[in-house]
Amino acid sequence: MEDGPSNNASCFRRLTECFLSPSLTDEKVKAYLSLHPQVLDEFVSESVSAETVEKWLKRKNNKAEDEPSPKEVSRYQDTNMQGVVYELNSYIEQRLDTGGDNHLLLYELSSIIRIATKADGFALYFLGECNNSLCVFTPPGMKEGQPRLIPAGPITQGTTISAYVAKSRKTLLVEDILGDERFPRGTGLESGTRIQSVLCLPIVTAIGDLIGILELYRHWGKEAFCLSHQEVATANLAWASVAIHQVQVCRGLAKQTELNDFLLDVSKTYFDNIVAIDSLLEHIMIYAKNLVNADRCALFQVDHKNKELYSDLFDIGEEKEGKPVFKKTKEIRFSIEKGIAGQVARTGEVLNIPDAYADPRFNREVDLYTGYTTRNILCMPIVSRGSVIGVVQMVNKISGSAFSKTDENNFKMFAVFCALALHCANMYHRIRHSECIYRVTMEKLSYHSICTSEEWQGLMHFNLPARICRDIELFHFDIGPFENMWPGIFVYMIHRSCGTSCFELEKLCRFIMSVKKNYRRVPYHNWKHAVTVAHCMYAILQNNNGLFTDLERKGLLIACLCHDLDHRGFSNSYLQKFDHPLAALYSTSTMEQHHFSQTVSILQLEGHNIFSTLSSSEYEQVLEIIRKAIIATDLALYFGNRKQLEEMYQTGSLNLHNQSHRDRVIGLMMTACDLCSVTKLWPVTKLTANDIYAEFWAEGDEMKKLGIQPIPMMDRDKRDEVPQGQLGFYNAVAIPCYTTLTQILPPTEPLLKACRDNLNQWEKVIRGEETAMWISGPATSKSTSEKPTRKVDD
């Protein structure tokens, strides 16, 4: 043990003296180590790890095994190859059946041909993406860190010999490539040794498809290839191509049998369990991926009415128990005019795209949405009764640069069955949709009824007191104390805003009283709230006279009165979370779409169609105004709408003559009216907040019964957090809403001022201060700087 350090020092001293010599060369080092092997032994034992030594031994053994015997070489030099063809066939079949890589298999066969032709080396090329370029194949482990297919250049003449052969598909034997002007770049290889003689052969399948190029070469000074070498190489490649084709045909037949078995299996699955249609679609998509060896799969259905493609089932690229996972998420839609899927849906043609981003038809929106990168696509239409009802899209071939013709043919047959499955799915969806409509309708009819003749006749003869006629013009007017007059207040507002002859009075009274009947007795979203919202819209229209058309004024006032029809006191998220039939009917803006549906239902009742005097085009217009206005009360849509309006206002691009801009402004007006309780006098605002939270807490109580913890806003156990919650609501929602509205419609500034006053009151509540406030006396919504004041206490 003590001799170790001195021996090591001696070893390294001798090595150091050797390596520091100014005339040191590789030959001198090798010569020195040959004469002093103990130095190498000492150096390796002390400085080289056991893993490295093991790697050297493995490489040496592999090299020895790779070198064939003269007898074995002679077998492959027989151009008839009867002695090895069956062995070759068996070898290829075994490799392919066990999932062997075609590229690696051809590389191994090329190595045999190199030995048989006594070449110094070879290069194997395969076609790149789009089949217009070549890539050099590098087997794994040969050069660590390098890809298996390295781009070598385009397929064209006037560059390299491999590109020339790929272009012409003819074998070339060149004795001296350096002197051949057809190949200015020679072989294009960097072998470290000058190449002189080259034998370059195309690798062609039995059906004539080019799959690669084999380039054999000999170094400078060696004997050039001759015709016999060409014959040996050609014979070997020909037999290899036939063998590969034969095995692939057998595999295709096996695949066909597997496909037939699968179709029978899916048929049984469908008829045994028709309810689980999503499971059926997943089953189909999983097999489609395996059929063409794709990385991702997507199935889009066609909405011919709106000319859109849509999907809610996505391949997220994960696996569970060896099977792909498909996730059902929020539905995405895009125009049928966009993308490769849209092209297939429009034309009904199959598209095989080897390079997606190089194709101008490719729609990158889906990649941006999912964060996935699409390289190549195989897209197939699903046709039923002569019409494209869906599109199946395979994305990114896993093994190979692109989807092949075989993939395309197999997929065509598979798409026929997809059409049957999708047709059945659509039929089942329509049945389910009808069942949901029926259940909701029966529930509604069991609760609601049409107004009596006494109710609407009493309204026809009602006259509003003069004092209320004055106060109704104020933005902060409170209808609360006048419950029996609410229907009459709405009739008055209609006549003041639209004229006394705008509707038949009898139909108008029937309509109003039936709308009242269809509001449920919930704490907040009730008949009182409907009239309050309608009054705020009335005040906005009156203070912006001449800005809106007669149809818009009629439609907006009716929309406000009906905007919460048949509200159950539960939020959209609650209905969707617990699979309420309404959520099945309307996937987005659930309650808002139901409110509009109820509005149309009342209009269709006998004697209730207040728009019956309009022309058909005007009738469609006013219904669309009402629909858009009611949908706009979905607070989830408000944030994006207000942001767009703010940007347009700041940039000066807002144009009220532009219909889309006008729709956005009306949407903001509807939100402002829906939230108008925050613009009333403080006592009214405070009482309304109590009603709102009573409804929230009732929903929270229901969630607790089901074992779900509600959000703090809906938890009555956290009522102490109400003032702080209101502060956040005012700052995040109400103040921005009325600020943007005031910018666009300046006469609505009193709404913003009142909202800020109430924000101050909530801040006082948080600080524990008195919340009495001074307000203006009887006045209009204009300046009140010289009006008498009065004190209002909570």
Swiss-Prot record:
It is found in: Cytoplasm, Cytosol. Its cofactor is a divalent metal cation. Detected in striatum and testis (at protein level). Detected in whole brain, hippocampus, olfactory bulb, striatum neurons and testis. It catalyses: a nucleoside 3',5'-cyclic phosphate + H2O = a nucleoside 5'-phosphate + H(+); 3',5'-cyclic AMP + H2O = AMP + H(+); 3',5'-cyclic GMP + H2O = GMP + H(+). Binds 2 divalent metal cations per subunit. Site 1 may preferentially bind zinc ions, while site 2 has a preference for magnesium and/or manganese ions. A divalent metal cation 2 binds at D564. InterPro entries: GAF (IPR003018), GAF-like_dom_sf (IPR029016), HD/PDEase_dom (IPR003607), PDEase (IPR023088), PDEase_catalytic_dom (IPR002073), PDEase_catalytic_dom_sf (IPR036971), PDEase_CS (IPR023174). This is cAMP and cAMP-inhibited cGMP 3',5'-cyclic phosphodiesterase 10A.
